């Protein structure tokens, strides 16, 4: 039934069930006259069996299935392009009404991470990030966020890839906290035992620091938090991240600390992301400034070698400089890692996502 659904001919009154978390799905099913336990049954079909055909949901009454068909549908936008890196990273592109988003799967020995997008484009215009240079189109719906995970799991199963998705990171296109309501709703589905069932410690939301939204987030959901800091002081951050002129480092870290005190998912500390830009933010003095800045913030630091794209005149810090920077932080007592570049050859690495089709390999 739904395998070849024409999304443009669906009545506006119909609801895509991928837009509903468990609570909202329960209210919807009750409005159809279904029993309470039907909620878990429907979610199991959707998220365990990836079923988009109500006729196949045989443990649900015919009456309820008929009403579901009349009032709702299940639709996950399919990937239209796939690129596979030499290191096993896979990048998928989704077309949503002629606008593109990208999703990246990164397999490792002990885990497999899916990087999802929360917006089409991004309004923050961080100078070192390709997504921001493409401009902002719109927020993704809950169903469009969930569809990335849904389709990724289906695609991995089709490929007989046995490495299940163990971690999900909101580090793709867009600023998650500028799509707060939909991102939080999607997160509840990701964490729900009848949804994707991931642990909150295995789900990470990365933000540039939208302070009012971050303050709200701590009362909405508990997941691992990453702060895209990228500078040891406001002077540098103002230059490379224009959002800092609105929410400066002090306000961002203050809000992050409040989230940490609320959270159980961040016991090991908040992740501080720091892109390494040659002669901009990578000096020994910058490392010392960063250590002072974070001295009262329970944190672990992830240094990110800058991934190039056409446009900016940045250079990535060389390996020796990155190692020196990391060692200074380690000597100051900070857990410091250097991110391994994944998928750089297919423009799937951190800061390279644009949603532009390049015809490397089409589905």
Swiss-Prot record:
It is found in: Cytoplasm. PROSITE patterns: RADICAL_SAM (PS51918). Its cofactor is [4Fe-4S] cluster. Gene3D superfamilies: 1.10.150.530, Aldolase class I. One of its GO terms (cellular component) is cytoplasm. CDD domains: Radical_SAM. [4Fe-4S] cluster binds at residues 122, 126, 129. One of its GO terms (biological process) is tRNA methylation. InterPro entries: Aldolase_TIM, Methyltransferase_A, RlmN_N, RNA_MTrfase_RlmN, rRNA_lsu_MTrfase_RlmN/Cfr, rSAM. Binds 1 [4Fe-4S] cluster. The cluster is coordinated with 3 cysteines and an exchangeable S-adenosyl-L-methionine. Keywords: 4Fe-4S, Cytoplasm, Disulfide bond, Iron, Iron-sulfur, Metal-binding, Methyltransferase, rRNA processing, S-adenosyl-L-methionine, Transferase, tRNA processing. Its EC number is 2.1.1.192. The keyword rRNA processing applies. It catalyses: adenosine(2503) in 23S rRNA + 2 reduced [2Fe-2S]-[ferredoxin] + 2 S-adenosyl-L-methionine = 2-methyladenosine(2503) in 23S rRNA + 5'-deoxyadenosine + L-methionine + 2 oxidized [2Fe-2S]-[ferredoxin] + S-adenosyl-L-homocysteine; adenosine(37) in tRNA + 2 reduced [2Fe-2S]-[ferredoxin] + 2 S-adenosyl-L-methionine = 2-methyladenosine(37) in tRNA + 5'-deoxyadenosine + L-methionine + 2 oxidized [2Fe-2S]-[ferredoxin] + S-adenosyl-L-homocysteine. S-adenosyl-L-methionine binds at residues 174-175, 206, 228-230, 307. GO terms for molecular function: 4 iron, 4 sulfur cluster binding; metal ion binding; rRNA (adenine(2503)-C2-)-methyltransferase activity; rRNA binding; tRNA (adenine(37)-C2)-methyltransferase activity; tRNA binding. Disulfide bonds join 115-350. Belongs to the radical SAM superfamily. RlmN family. Specifically methylates position 2 of adenine 2503 in 23S rRNA and position 2 of adenine 37 in tRNAs. m2A2503 modification seems to play a crucial role in the proofreading step occurring at the peptidyl transferase center and thus would serve to optimize ribosomal fidelity. This is Dual-specificity RNA methyltransferase RlmN. It comes from Buchnera aphidicola subsp. Acyrthosiphon pisum (strain APS) (Acyrthosiphon pisum symbiotic bacterium). The gene is rlmN.
